[in-house]
Amino acid sequence: CIRDSLVRPIEYGADIVVHSATKFIGGHGTTIGGVIVEGGKFDWETSGKFPSLTEPNPSYHGISFTKACGPAAFVTKIRAILLRDTGATISPVSSFIFLQGLETLSLRAERHVENALKVVQYLNNHPMVEKVHHPSVTDDESQKALYAKYFPNGGGSIFTFEIKGDAQTAKDFIDNLELFSLLA
């Protein structure tokens, strides 16, 4: 999703990446969904840490997912067991909505990054803000180098910040938001 426009985790060694399709792929938060991407290079068998993939599975006639599926053991188990046991199958309408959102994802990702950086810079210089948490905010040279390496197109649009004051100050702040809204 948006993360892959900004950083490509599998290229940097991640074996599994989990995306929230709700937040960025759809673009409007109207549909709930997620995506699991497996790099396909991890040796599930040799690590000795994943018996649910390497040992015989009684619900699948004793097959071992690693023996039957090799590098695709994890994703096959997700499809075979998770979908069967939880019904986590996306509906046709949800699929359509996510596909519509994918058409504008790259443009939205650019705008998300631009807008987030403006807000992050504003908050980072605001006297009522204690600290801003975003990959672009650092004085440490090694952190700046990592930011440049891993986020050449920007550090994303998700950030947090701490305001100065007590719980009432925080409540008053939330009640007076105009640019953002609290959805939780």
Please give the residue ranges for each predicted region.
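Conserved PLP-enzyme active-site core in the AAT-like
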Residues: R3-N125, H133
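Conserved C-terminal alpha-helix-loop-beta "cap" of PLP-dependent enzymes
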Residues: M128-A184
